[in-house]
Regions:
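Basic, Lys/Arg-enriched alpha-helical interface segments
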Residues: 1-66, 76-80, 87-110
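Short, surface-exposed beta-strand/loop micro-motifs that present aromatic residues
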Residues: 69-73
Length: 110
């Protein structure tokens, strides 16, 4: 369920299979590129437009197209876990899904 994306500097990025499937499914290649650039910047410690959504989770807001969102959690300074993604129209549903995925991660990695 968890795919190691890469380590850059001292930050390791993990992707859930849910996040990876969502990103691959995006038809807009420019959107995929913009999202990947934001993830690369996170790995460099530059999080940009991020909003805490509670329970230790945050969303990256990407001002492109329908308003893409990437939901993530962070453990310490070295590990960022990408949970799921969506856009403004599916935000409520995506946040619920992100919370379930985060709970699963925390149970598997106490």
């Amino acid at each position: 369920m968890w795919l190691k994306s890469y380590t850059r500097g001292m930050t390791e990025i993990l992707r859930s299979s849910t996040f990876s499937a969502w990103l691959l499914k995006l038809a807009d290649s420019r959107a995929r590129m913009r999202i990947q650039v934001r993830i690369d910047r996170m790995a460099d410690g530059q999080f940009g437009d991020v909003k805490a959504i509670g329970e230790g989770l945050s969303e990256i807001r990407i001002d492109y197209g329908p308003g893409y969102r990437v939901y993530f959690m962070q453990q310490g300074r070295q590990l960022v876990i990408l949970l799921c993604g969506g856009d403004k129209s599916s935000q409520t549903r995506d946040i619920k899904q992100a919370r379930l995925i985060a709970k699963s991660w925390q149970e598997q990695n106490p």
